[in-house]
């Protein structure tokens, strides 16, 4: 069953997961949300034995239903690879009865690497699926770690202003 996404402002505007990924926002400025929240078909105990990549696939396949298994696994493998300084990607540690999930092992050392590492792979796969031939151009203006984390996966050309702490143009 394919999950359908609709606008938060107008339920008549719908899209597949790949279309929603490419559009980003709905035409009325809303966000794409799924018509229903799928159940995860993995027992909680089994999740503790799975790698980050396996968990990512188990979750994403329920939401990105127009992607094939091969497409999703390829996106995940390319996103969560040697860019992270540990094969665990997001290690879980226990100390004094509390658990800590380390989300800083990505290329920019920001928790945003977790989500933004896969975005370019999902976008290029979605573009192929929807016969989009144009290049994907991401323009961001930021002074924080979100922009850096987003650009890391897309970096073919990065422009930094002269006021930036790290002045450079990278092509």
Where are these regions (language model features)?
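Well-ordered mid-protein domain cores that form the structural environment of catalytic cofactors
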Residues: 99-156
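Gly/Ser/Thr-rich beta-alpha loop segments that engage phosphate groups in nucleotides
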Residues: 26, 31, 146-149
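Charged, compositionally biased N-terminal leader segments and the immediate start
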Residues: 1-28
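Single conserved hydrophobic/aromatic residue that forms the stacking wall/gate
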Residues: 160-171
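Structural motif
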Residues: 30-31, 98-99, 136-137, 162
């Amino acid at each position: 069953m394919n999950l359908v996404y609709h606008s938060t402002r107008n339920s008549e505007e719908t899209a597949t997961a790949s279309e929603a990924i490419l559009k980003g926002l709905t035409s009325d400025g809303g966000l794409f949300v799924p018509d229903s929240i799928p159940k995860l078909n993995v027992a909680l105990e089994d999740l503790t034995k799975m790698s980050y990549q396996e968990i990512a696939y188990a979750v994403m396949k329920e939401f990105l239903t127009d992607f094939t298994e091969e497409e999703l696994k390829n996106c995940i493998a390319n996103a969560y690879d040697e860019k992270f300084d540990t094969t665990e990607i997001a290690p879980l540690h226990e100390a004094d009865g509390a658990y800590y999930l380390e989300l800083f092992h990505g290329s920019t050392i920001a928790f945003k690497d977790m989500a933004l590492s896969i975005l370019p792979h999902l976008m290029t796969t979605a573009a192929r699926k929807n016969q989009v031939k144009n290049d994907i151009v991401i323009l961001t203006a930021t002074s924080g770690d979100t922009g850096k984390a987003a650009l890391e996966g897309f970096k073919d050309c990065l422009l930094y202003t002269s006021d930036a702490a790290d002045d450079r143009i990278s092509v």
